[in-house]
Amino acid sequence: MVGTWFLCRGFTTLAGLLLLPFGSLAASQIEDQAEQFFRSGHTNNWAVLVCTSRFWFNYRHVANTLSVYRSVKRLGIPDSHIVLMLADDMACNPRNPKPATVYSHKNMELNVYGDDVEVDYRSYVVTVENFLRVLTGRIPPSTPRSKRLLSDDRSNILIYMTGHGGNGFLKFQDSEEITNIELADAFEQMWQKRRYNELLFIIDTCQGASMYERFYSPNIMALASSQVGEDSLSHQPDPAIGVHLMDRYTFYVLEFLEEINPASQTNMNDLFQVCPKSLCVSTPGHRTDPFQRDPKHVLITDFFGSVRKVEITTETISLQPDSGIMKSSHEKAGMDEELMEPLKYAEQLPVAQIIHQKPKLKDWHPPGGFILGLWALIIMVFFKTYGIKHMKFIF
């Protein structure tokens, strides 16, 4: 009996000694994962979206900016991490036939102004000075948090700008301009002050590529709607309001983004191809040499989406629900599967359905026969009133 006890004890000790390295290995792997997570260079995303144009005929520039705003919000970036600057309030413009709305598509179903737009800088507050102060953090202490870019050295920042520009400059409010040198220096200040990890700069304007020619700071990727010497063209004219609804480049970028979901593996190389010259008429450009990573390894959601926080733990968590609840949920799920087919992520969003639906039919116009009959009636009344002698005054 004693021998049997010593034999069992020996086997138990031997098994413990054999399993000890495996337990240590698992614990070390978890520690390595935790250390890698906390040392990650990317923990949060920010967006600075700027429309620099005023006046009703620049309606499309406001629609451009609001469309990008809705896309980044849909992919998870909250308003607290978005700085929205609109140089004019098209939603409340007296010429707007549908007040409190801004549309980006002909079918007039997608109101990009929406009910939850938070404009941080509006009207004449949108200036070159305020824009540069937001980027560099040189703002008065009384400035509210919603108007601050509170990024750090782990922040990926999307900066989108649209308006009227030329070779090496972008106009603000038709009264001042920012040059490519000023913009490059602002980005360098951001890098020196550790205000970003990686930066994506997108500009939709004439000769947009000239705005990123002077960049010299690291970890910047830039895209433009047109090359130097080219115009960036508008898209979707709407006779009802007398202006174009969007610019071509931003229109196709928006269509591309509507197919992206938070778990998408689409990379930046795909974004470079969204608007070829056959669609944009202008030649879009991009610059990646200051960027350290290969664009094909950079996900779209690294800039347009939220960063999902992951908590690593060694504790055991039970994932088994209550048996009664599980049974009822399975029965309900079975009924739902019979009633509906599975949908893709983009198909579940009302925005995507609106964008890809066919435009509404044009307004009713009288048929040609009706017009001819009306003219015949007018001529008969004329003859009856004045006679054939006045015919020479018509022809």
UniProtKB/Swiss-Prot annotation:
Enzyme class, spelled out: transferase
Membrane topology designation: Single-pass type I membrane protein
Transmembrane segments: 369-385
Record has Transport as a keyword: no
Pfam family, one: Peptidase_C13
Enzyme Commission number(s): 2.6.1.-
SS bonds (residue pairs): 275-280
Record text on activity regulation: In the absence of proproteins substrates, exists in an inactive state with a disrupted catalytic site by an autoinhibitory loop. The binding of proprotein substrates, particularly the CSP region, to GPI-T triggers concerted conformational changes that alleviate the inhibition by the autoinhibitory loop. Meanwhile, proprotein residues near the omega- site induce the formation of a catalytic cleft for catalysis, following which the products are released and GPI-T reverts to the inactive state.
Gene3D superfamilies hit by this protein: 3.40.50.1460
Superkingdom, natural source: Eukaryota
PTM notes: The disulfide bond between PIGK/GPI8 and PIGT is important for normal enzyme activity.
Entry annotated with the keyword Metal-binding: yes
Residues that coordinate or bind a protein: 206, 232, 234
Cytoplasmic side: 386-395
Residues annotated as catalytic: 164, 206
UniProt function note: Catalytic subunit of the glycosylphosphatidylinositol-anchor (GPI-anchor) transamidase (GPI-T) complex that catalyzes the formation of the linkage between a proprotein and a GPI-anchor and participates in GPI anchored protein biosynthesis. Recognizes diverse proproteins at a C-terminal signal peptide (CSP) region that lacks consensus sequence and replaces it with a GPI-anchor via a transamidation reaction. Transamidation catalysis reaction follows a two-phase mechanism.
PANTHER family named in the record: GPI-ANCHOR TRANSAMIDASE
Family of the protein in this entry: Belongs to the peptidase C13 family.
Protein name (record): GPI-anchor transamidase
Organism: Sus scrofa (Pig)
Gene responsible for this protein: PIGK
